[in-house]
Each structure stands twice: as C-alpha cells, then as structure tokens.
C-alpha cells in the first residue's frame, strides 16, 4: 500500500527541499493515494511504479517552488501568441500538435520536459541531459511493458506532447494513467 507521509518524505529527501508552496494539491494527492490503495488492485510492481511516479511528481513540485522563490522574475515571463490545441482523445490532436511543433518558429513542450519540468539539483542551466535520459528510460519502460501503447499514442521522449504531463502535478486531473 502507498503511504502518503513516506512519499512526501522521500520527495523531500531526494531534493533536500521542504517547501511545497501552495497546498492546493494536497487534497487531490490524498484522494489519489486512497483511490490507488482501495480501488486500483495493483500488484507489487504496480504499487512501486506508482510510488516512484508520485515521489517524482512531488519532487518536481518542490523544485518548481524553489525555482520561483530563487527567481521570482519567472512570473513576469510573457507568452506571446500561444497556440492552443483542443481535442478529445484518439482524434489526432497529438499529431496536429506535433505537426505545428515541427515549424522552427514554434516552441512546444517535449515529453521529457512535461514529465520532468524542473531542473535537478546538480543540473547546469541549458544542459538537461539527466532529465532527458530519465524521460527516455521511462518511455522505453512503457514500451517494454506495453508495446501496444504505441497504437494509441506516439510515445517519443523528444516529441512534443500534451499538457497532461504538467497537469498531473496539480492532482486536479479527471484522468490518471495507472
């Protein structure tokens, strides 16, 4: 079973950080842990995978909050002329997203950036090699565990991907991949 306090403490230990910032995520985090423990019927491997994922999400939240505290000017960044793609699952929205992202005049969030949005503790700005490798390993693990996953989503750690990777850090999603 997943233990809320154990997951929180492990995220703090991994990062050396304590401040999660806005506690708005806590209720959703607790609800998800309760749901996984009572409803998901996971085997030991599944429980460990979810524990690892949740520790990673909380570690990202800690790192992001730290980045905001250390660099408050981040909040003044302006996103000019955003392009927003809205679509239901399995309608081609990911491929549309990737087509638009292929234009060098556009910028898109890559899979590894969405999964690991915050710099790691020893990372040099502009050199996210470790986060890229973590993303690559995670996508490879998904492909090994479920090769058919490619039939429903074009998995590519260096490919443009959806905001769901960022939204999972809020614990406000109506969909969680387990």
Language-model-derived ranges and their functions:
Residues 176-178:
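Conserved small/polar residues in nucleotide/adenosyl-binding loops
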Residues 159, 171-174:
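Eukaryotic endomembrane system proteins
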Residues 1-52, 56, 64:
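Long, basic/Gly/Ser/Thr-rich N-terminal segments
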Residues 85-101:
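Glycine-rich phosphate-binding P-loop
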Residues 103-111:
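Post-Walker A helix-loop "phosphate-sensing" segment adjacent to the P-loop in P-loop NTPases
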Residues 117-165:
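P-loop NTPase motor core
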Residues 45-88:
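Long amphipathic N-terminal alpha/beta scaffold segment
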């Amino acid at each position: 079973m997943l233990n809320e306090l154990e997951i929180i403490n492990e995220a703090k230990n991994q990062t050396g950080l304590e401040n999660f910032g806005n506690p708005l995520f806590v209720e959703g985090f607790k609800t998800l842990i309760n749901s996984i423990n009572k409803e998901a019927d996971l085997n030991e491997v599944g429980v460990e995978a979810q524990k690892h994922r949740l520790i990673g999400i909380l570690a990202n939240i800690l790192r992001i909050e730290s980045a905001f505290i250390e660099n408050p000017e981040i909040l003044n960044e302006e996103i000019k002329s955003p392009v927003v793609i809205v679509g239901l699952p399995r309608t081609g929205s990911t491929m549309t997203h990737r087509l638009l992202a292929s234009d060098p005049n556009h910028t898109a969030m890559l899979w590894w950036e969405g999964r690991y949005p915050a710099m790691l503790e020893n990372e040099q700005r502009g050199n996210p090699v470790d986060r890229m490798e973590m993303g690559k390993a995670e996508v490879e693990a998904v492909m090994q565990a479920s090769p058919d996953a490619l039939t429903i989503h074009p998995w590519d750690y260096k490919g443009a991907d959806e905001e769901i990777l960022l939204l999972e850090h809020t614990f406000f999603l109506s969909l969680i991949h387990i």
